[in-house]
Amino acid sequence: MATFSGCYTALITPMDRNRQVDYEGLQQLVDFQIKNGVNGLLAVGTTGESPTLDWNEHTKVIEKVHEYSSNRCLTIAGTGSNSTQEAIDGTQHAHDFGVNCVLLVDPYYNGPSSLEIRKEYVEPIALQFPEVQIIPYIIPGRTGTQLYPQDLAVLHKQYPNVRCVKEATGDLKNMELTRQVCGEDFDILSGDDDKTYTMIISPDIAASGVISVVSNVAPRAVVDMVHYCLDGNEEAASVISQALQPLFNIVTVKTQEQTPYGPVACKARNPLAFKTLMNVLGMPSGPCRQPLGKMTRSGLDVVLINTRKIYESNPQILKPVSDYFGVDLKDRL
């Protein structure tokens, strides 16, 4: 079975002005990512707006990402659901098209226990598709539930195709326990860009890479940071990680907005800020589908201020965008 190592981009799904999938733009984004050295592409994760794509669109985007990549990198299909049968159907379709790796987010809203996630969700899929790599995706802040390390370890011991996790708990102790109970032959991928450096260099976590949002606009920098970490060059990796901090800051953008009845906290969550930034930079992106809307004026200011910091202090980070898409970033920012 494959070892998961490096940078895997959680690809956005570009839309046209009518909020229909822009497949020409998607092909450009796939090529841009591969030419900048990513190890793989996650199609239709949360960043790819899986909640608002119907399953016909969902499976077509997965097919197209796999087709466009032409086996130049790994395709990971986001086939998770809060319905096991739906996840099985999605995994079957991905497998039929030649995709042999899927990401299974913990079932959201209906909130099964960790035991149920193991026995009634991941296990049936791992059993039915032994030749497909299964990556559980642990993100309790979005799902309201969590597959715990102990149940993950049971899955890993019983099923050789469960040998990796996307870890987005934000809890370093949970990550350390995952390493402890799952062993050295289990791969941990960061699901939070701002924690990737720490997760890889920590000997008690020993992550091997990241499924990244930030690499949508800065693939080469994230690729290099991860490779330096894995090669033991922590100083070089730290320099890049610090340089990327302004982009880490905008994965989620928090502002306070005024209403006639007083101020309201506003949290623009991924992928809204990054799709907004990609529009600004001249990359294929388009709008998000409702109920995600538009950045507020103050939210857009946060995106622009942080991106200008990157452009002014470390212009090489965004240079692949200008080189590939032929845009003048100075004019756009």
Where are these regions (language model features)?
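A general structural signal for well-ordered alpha-helical segments in protein cores
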Residues: L26, I62, A87, V122, ...
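Active-site beta->alpha loop and helix N-cap motifs at the rims of alpha/beta catalytic domains
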Residues: A2-Q146, V154, P291-G293, I317-L333
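Structured C-terminal cap/extension of enzyme domains
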Residues: I200-L333
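Active-site glycine- and acidic-residue-rich loops that bind
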Residues: E116, T169-G170, V264
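Catalytic alpha/beta core domains of metabolic enzymes, predominantly
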Residues: P124-V132, I139-Q256
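A generic alpha-helix structural signal
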Residues: V30, I62, T91, R179, ...
